Structures are given as C-alpha cells and as structure tokens.
Amino acid sequence: GEKQALTDEQAERLLDTIRGLPPYVFVMIGLYTELRREEILALQWDSVYLEDEVPYLSVRRAWHTEHNRPVILNELKTKAAERNIPLPVCLAKCLREAKEKSTSDYVVANRDGGPLSYTQFKRLWQYIVTRTAKPRVIRKYVDGKYEKHTIYPQLGEKARNNGHCIY
C-alpha cells in the first residue's frame, strides 16, 4: 500500500481526539518535525531546548527493541542522522506543557518513566490508528486497467500542515 500523509482535517481530528492523552506528544512531534518513530521514542529532555530564542530539538539517539525490551542507541548510524530541528510555536508550547508534568528523562515515557517497550509502542500506535481516518480505496490506472489501492493514512509522512499549527 502507498503511504499518504494525513490531511489537515485528519490531523486536526486526531489531535482533538487525543489531546491530553499519552499519544498526544508523540503525534505532535511526528506531525511537526518529521522525526522517525525510533527517534521520537528515544528523545530525552536533555535534547529539547525550549528556552532558546528559537526552540529546537536535537536528534542524537534512536530507540529499538530486543525481545520487547527497549534499547536506546546513543550512537546514530550516520552523522547525517544527527540533526537539530527548529520547533514551530505550537510544538514548543506542547512540549513545555509536557515537560512541566513529566517525571521522566524521556519525552514519550511509559508509566515507570522509561522508554516504551515494543508492546507499549504497538498499543500507542493502535490507539492512534483507530482514531485516525479510515483507509481509503482509490482507483489507479496501471498497465491499461484500473486497480484498487487501499491508502492508509500514515503519521510521520511529510504532512502538508507542517508550516502552520493546528490549535
């Protein structure tokens, strides 16, 4: 299936549904920074600079799991993977609020303050998926005939709404 970015309306509906719930910060970061999920789940507050004139976050770590246990890699595969990403106003605001409440080193944490396990991530993801748009079927002209394609809206694709914020 093809990956398709969420439309503005879908993104807005999703954010409304999950505001104040655990997936909210994850989704906000995904929508406004284009970080990969492995990067979001490894993000720690020491890499989020909210007091700077232009707030930004720094990508330095990646999350993966072994036997369902989270493993945080401090060495990214390539130097190019390390980057600083400026935060739009609404995301900086969202992260400030999250940080005030947070008792963890991790921006997206489980109840114990640790990084998510694979099962916890799947649960988070399911939660998001069930509240996002339904898959759409489109007809595509391939080799002289129409074929049906199901499009599942995906987070983390380059969303058109990156430039402006939804509130």
What label would you give each PLM region?
Residues 53, 68-69, 113:
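Detector for glycine-centered tight turns/loop "hinges" at secondary-structure junctions
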Residues 12-23, 33, 85, 100-107, ...:
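Short, basic (Lys/Arg/His-rich) helix/loop patches that form interaction surfaces
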Residues 48-64, 123-132:
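Conserved long hydrophobic alpha-helices within structured protein cores
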Residues 31, 37, 44-45, 59-61, ...:
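Active-site proximal loops enriched in glycine and acidic residues that flank catalytic Cys/His/Asp
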Residues 58-82, 88, 95-96:
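Extended, highly charged linker/hinge segments and catalytic-adjacent loops that couple domains
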Residues 1-43, 51-53, 80-82, 101:
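Basic, Lys/Arg- and aromatic-enriched nucleic-acid-binding interface segment
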Residues 42-48, 157, 167:
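A short, basic/aromatic helix-end/turn motif that makes direct DNA contacts
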